[in-house]
Amino acid sequence: MQSQNISDIIEKYLKSILADSEHVEIRRSEIADLFNVVPSQINYVIKTRFTIQNGYLVESKRGGGGYIRIEKVNLVDDADVLDALIQVIGDSITQRDAYAVVQSLYEDDVLNRREAQLILVAIDHETLGLTDRDLENSLRARIIIGILNHLRYES
């Protein structure tokens, strides 16, 4: 049996709440208390697991009544979200982040399994075959942005 680390457990917990609702509003300290971790652990989970590349929008409000709101979004159906994702990608995207974008498109039923696998092969380090990592990430970004723009205008 494979053990899970606390970040995986917190992520699974938040995703289970999101499965029943369009969004979740949490108080960082309450979730930290629930899992007996420091609040910065909750920040880490949210910053690394609930990114726009993964199909989530996160809004936080600081202060006494502060909260963190996490919303699962369909990357292609919302032009503003798509624009934000393209802006985040910018001129460069790592293989890991690009895989997360493709996974989100697959989970949103924008891509079928075969299409997602073909894209993953096309943006893979071995396929691109470049020794310059910056150039590789730049080329990968251009491919992903091209796909996203095509999906935007597909009927």
Curated annotation (Swiss-Prot):
**Protein role:** Binds to the ftsH promoter region, leading to repression of its expression.
Among Gene3D superfamilies, the record links this protein to: Transcriptional regulator CtsR, C-terminal domain, Transcriptional regulator CtsR, winged HTH domain
**Subunit structure as annotated in this protein's UniProt entry:** Homodimer.
Q: What happens when the gene is disrupted?
A: Disruption leads to increased expression of ftsH, indicating CtsR is a transcriptional repressor.
- Alphabetic keyword roster: DNA-binding, Repressor, Transcription, Transcription regulation
Query: Which molecular function GO terms apply here?
Result: DNA binding
InterPro entries in the cross-refs: CtsR, CtsR_C, CtsR_C_sf, CtsR_N, CtsR_N_sf
**Family note:** Belongs to the CtsR family.
Taxonomy of the source species: Bacteria, Bacillati, Bacillota, Bacilli, Lactobacillales
Q: What is this protein called?
A: Transcriptional regulator CtsR
Q: Gene behind this chain?
A: ctsR
Q: Which branch of life, at top level? A: Bacteria
Name the Gene Ontology biological process terms. regulation of DNA-templated transcription
